[in-house]
């Protein structure tokens, strides 16, 4: 550890504000709440993109000329959503946006963002994503303890592509390989994710406090016998077919007669928006399609029912937000929604007729009033408590002496399993060190080392890999 009293937790993630995706928002809140009690030092490590790549990713033409400018933007965004002083650091690693994958991939050895002498505990948000093409020091060697948090059901997305089942077969083993090499502990947000050896399923995410505040205002209206919800049903999500729109429009099309009086509003932006609008227009039902908005926008406060048939999410953020706002949620009876079943306003269905019954029943009654404990379960305070418990952070902090790679893992270092793991890690190191093999497996060309522009923006030396990058210990 950096000192005997304080853990240093470095949280690495695959996206950053202003991109309002789950891996940008949730690790940001995690960093804030982990650092809030002052018992540990926390550093959030996020990708830096060159101007060209920023324009491909960030909404509303938002761009940054320097990492410090983006850091200021990120901090301001978070300060508007929490009520306490932010006590964590922000650092950047070089990244590039992969258009075909619609995601940011690391460039070079991103573990270099944390100096060796500061390396203690690493949290890899989307560990498979961060390590597919990792070429540098082994994460378990550099850090005393590495925790992976699995956010995304990559196999489900890949299965929807051409030759999807074949791709998913190989991706499953690639994910298991890299996560096993680089993580001591794996937390899966729900059982909808790929299974990993020695992993634990726990939802360690909470909701933006703004949604709980909205829910409290609605609760007060209910207590005063006022009408808190004056609108009907809606759905909000990135407008791509795989994000629940395909399932929702199929259900609406098949059951138009039973749902003849239903009016649904859809909100979102995305690559499939025109196709989705066209499909909605063909229905006899009234289905309105609008551009995406922040879910906390006052526009959404008065909707009573949130329809979410998506089964590709691991734990759907918008479902949690809708419940926090006091709404009724109608969602599929799917393992990704298991966490939400504890709330009385969560209504699940197994088939089309079940969807019709649940939707009509939800529209015809008032939502149950959430208890204080139920609201707490949705909060980031509760999510942080769950994370600390399942990741064993308190057990680590109570150790009689500092963690060390040698003392904690000495018994396994001489085992056959450890030797095989080291050999496996070395094979991955070799394979990820050649441009041809990297690109063959889907890496962005030229991502082995940061280019001149990334180096200039981040103050790195061009074509001078650090010792960590040159050597896989």
Swiss-Prot record:
Pfam families registered for this protein in UniProt: Glycos_transf_1 (PF00534)
Reactions catalysed: a 1,2-diacyl-3-O-(beta-D-galactosyl)-sn-glycerol + UDP-alpha-D-galactose = a 1,2-diacyl-3-O-[alpha-D-galactosyl-(1->6)-beta-D-galactosyl]-sn-glycerol + UDP + H(+)
Effect of residue 241 to F: Reduces catalytic activity 50-fold
Highest taxon above the source species: Eukaryota
Region annotation Interaction with the membrane lipid bilayer: where it falls in the sequence: 130-148, 227-245
Cellular compartment(s): Plastid, Chloroplast outer membrane
Triggers of expression: 30-fold up-regulation by phosphate deficiency.
CDD domains in UniProt: Glycosyltransferase_GTB-type
Alphabetized InterPro entries for the sequence: DGDG1/2, Glyco_trans_1
Swiss-Prot/TrEMBL GO biological process terms: cellular response to phosphate starvation; glycolipid biosynthetic process
Activation/inhibition comment: Stimulated by anionic phospholipids.
Phenotype for residue 241 to A: Reduces catalytic activity 100-fold
Knockout consequences: No visible phenotype under normal growth conditions.
Gene Ontology CC: one annotated term: chloroplast outer membrane
Outcome reported for the amino acid change (mutating residue 25 to A): Reduces catalytic activity 3-fold
Chloroplast as UniProt keyword: yes
Predominant cellular place of this UniProt entry's protein: plastid
Effect after changing residue 243 to A: Abolishes catalytic activity
Protein task: Involved in the synthesis of diacylglycerol galactolipids that are specifically found in thylakoid membranes. Specific for alpha-glycosidic linkages. During phosphate shortage, involved in the biosynthesis of digalactosyldiacylglycerol (DGDG) which rescues the limitation of phospholipids.
Family: Belongs to the glycosyltransferase group 1 family. Glycosyltransferase 4 subfamily.
Protein name per its UniProtKB record: Digalactosyldiacylglycerol synthase 2, chloroplastic
């Amino acid at each position: 550890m950096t000192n005997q009293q304080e853990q240093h937790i470095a949280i690495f993630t695959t996206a950053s504000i202003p991109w309002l995706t789950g891996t940008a928002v949730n690790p940001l809140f995690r960093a804030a709440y982990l650092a809030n009690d002052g018992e540990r030092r926390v550093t959030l490590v996020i990708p830096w993109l060159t101007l060209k790549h920023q324009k491909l990713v960030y909404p509303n033409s938002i761009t940054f000329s320097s990492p410090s400018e983006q850091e200021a933007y990120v901090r301001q965004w978070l300060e508007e959503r929490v009520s306490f002083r932010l006590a964590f650091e922000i650092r950047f690693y070089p990244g590039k946006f992969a258009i075909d994958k619609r995601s940011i991939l690391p460039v070079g050895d991103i573990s270099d963002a944390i100096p060796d002498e500061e390396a203690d505990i690493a949290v890899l948000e989307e560990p498979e994503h961060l390590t597919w093409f990792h070429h540098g020091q082994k994460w378990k060697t550099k850090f005393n303890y590495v925790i992976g948090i699995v956010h995304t059901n990559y196999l489900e997305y890949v299965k929807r592509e051409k030759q999807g089942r074949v791709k998913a077969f190989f991706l499953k083993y690639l994910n298991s390989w890299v996560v096993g090499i680089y993580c001591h502990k794996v937390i899966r947000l729900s059982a909808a994710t790929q299974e990993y050896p020695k992993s634990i399923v726990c939802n360690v995410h909470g909701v933006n406090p703004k949604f709980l505040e909205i829910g409290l205002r609605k609760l007060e209206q209910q207590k005063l016998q006022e009408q808190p919800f004056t609108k009907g049903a809606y759905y909000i999500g990135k407008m791509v077919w795989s994000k629940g729109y395909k399932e929702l429009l199929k259900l609406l099309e098949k059951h138009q007669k039973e749902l003849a009086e239903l009016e649904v509003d859809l909100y979102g932006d995305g690559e499939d928006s025109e196709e989705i609008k066209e499909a909605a227009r063909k229905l006899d039902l009234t289905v309105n399609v609008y551009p995406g908005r922040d879910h906390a926008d006052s526009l959404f406060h008065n909707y009573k029912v949130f329809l979410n048939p998506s089964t590709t999410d691991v734990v759907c953020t918008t479902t949690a937000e809708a419940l926090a706002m006091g709404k009724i949620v109608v969602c599929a009876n799917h393992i990704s929604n298991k966490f939400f079943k504890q709330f009385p306003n969560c209504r699940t269905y197994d088939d089309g007729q079940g969807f019709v019954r649940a939707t009509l029943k939800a529209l015809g009654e008032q939502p149950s009033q959430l208890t204080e404990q139920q609201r707490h379960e949705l909060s980031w305070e509760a999510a942080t408590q769950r994370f600390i418990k399942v990741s064993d952070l308190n057990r680590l902090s109570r150790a009689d002496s500092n963690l060390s790679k040698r003392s904690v893992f000495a018994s396994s270092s001489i085992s056959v399993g450890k030797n095989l793991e080291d050999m496996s890690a070395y094979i991955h190191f070799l394979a990820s060190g050649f441009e041809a093999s990297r690109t063959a497996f889907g890496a962005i060309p030229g991502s082995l080392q940061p280019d001149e522009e990334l180096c200039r923006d981040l103050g790195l030396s061009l074509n001078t890999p650090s010792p960590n990058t040159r050597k896989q210990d």
